[in-house]
């Protein structure tokens, strides 16, 4: 199995940062009330993950081990600031909607964890691929959870997509159900907790089904030779 395929499987499924490592739950639960918010924060996190992994991999031989964590945090904070300024300039409505959760990417355990566990020990290309697949895995969970919460809570999908993609994206809005009033449980953090629980349970069921279909390796019985004195 190639290294890229291994990194892809780890980031998207086997070691998914949200469903397996359970990292970054604060923004996952707070921001995923709509697909637009989830996708916006997911893209921002992905960009910071790739940028921080690449930068950490480039400077890993020049940073003393005693101060590596503060240096990594400074790198991540610089990248988050760049992403925040870009979002403020080109997606101001989404910037206001996400609020404090954009700068809080600095404290996201996924980013500092990948910088310390992988990027600081590998070359630039594997580090970039690791950041991309981990970020994409996080983004996919955000989008799936955001879709479920938006459909159940508001009966819509891609509501407010113009905040991220521009005026043309208003045509993407889909009204799945018509509600006289929103279902608040799905839109509030308790609904997000329930949704994450269902996603983790679904992944566990799928993993068990995959494991059951794989041929079991039978261990060869080892017989102990009995030695007797003749």
Swiss-Prot record:
Primary localisation category: membrane
Classification via HAMAP family: RsxE_RnfE
| Transmembrane intervals | 18-38, 39-59, 69-89, 93-113, 124-144, 182-202
Record's protein name: Ion-translocating oxidoreductase complex subunit E
Q: Which organism is it from?
A: Vibrio cholerae serotype O1 (strain ATCC 39541 / Classical Ogawa 395 / O395)
What gene is this protein translated from?
A: rnfE
Which GO CC terms are listed, alphabetically? plasma membrane
The record, for Pfam families, names:
Rnf-Nqr
Cite the EC number.
7.-.-.-
What family is this?
Belongs to the NqrDE/RnfAE family.
The chain's Cytoplasmic topological domains, given as residue ranges, are 1-17, 60-68, 114-123, 203-230
Ordered alphabetically, the record's keywords are: Cell inner membrane, Cell membrane, Electron transport, Membrane, Translocase, Transmembrane, Transmembrane helix, Transport
Quaternary structure note: The complex is composed of six subunits: RnfA, RnfB, RnfC, RnfD, RnfE and RnfG.
Task: Check the record and name the PANTHER family matching this protein.
Answer: ELECTRON TRANSPORT COMPLEX PROTEIN RNFE, ION-TRANSLOCATING OXIDOREDUCTASE COMPLEX SUBUNIT E
Localization, per the record, is: Cell inner membrane
Ranked from the top, the taxonomy reads: Bacteria, Pseudomonadati, Pseudomonadota, Gammaproteobacteria, Vibrionales
Matching entries from InterPro entries are given as:
NqrDE/RnfAE, RnfE
Q: How does the protein's chain sit in the membrane according to the entry? A: Multi-pass membrane protein
Periplasmic-side stretches of the chain, per the record, are 90-92, 145-181
Q: Name one GO biological process term.
A: electron transport chain
What's its job? Answer: Part of a membrane-bound complex that couples electron transfer with translocation of ions across the membrane.
Q: Which domain of life is it from?
A: Bacteria
